């Protein structure tokens, strides 16, 4: 998992692509006060128009140039998808806690989406509910959701993954033990996308 320069959170829900989708981006470099902020990028861009309905999920990468910068977009078009809302609870771990990085992917698109990174500032303790920066992802209804974790107590870093088979509705739970470092419980709430054809 990469540590990007900019961590963008959201969208809170998936975007149903039935009409043109416009992304609006405004990035600023923070100054000491809000009036000292400097514009880095101001962009409104139309999502690549898929003039056909693909039968397989695909990853679309496109660059957009604004007056002051170029932004690289990466968009996953997930076919026949359901929405997965993920939550994480720490069942056990070291007394001083651990640092964690959480990501999700599908088995067809191996591109990981960062759900949360505690860095070296936020320690997770037994009993904690981890507040994910991003908790909603889209998954093919016939595929698998793969949640991966990289956990560290400061001296050792270990990884683990947990797979979930999607449902149209309902809740799935599963536990992940990362060697002797920690045990986590994942809860995934499944739902269909709701959209109007008008």
Task: Describe each region flagged by the PLM.
Residues 1-198:
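Peripheral membrane interaction modules
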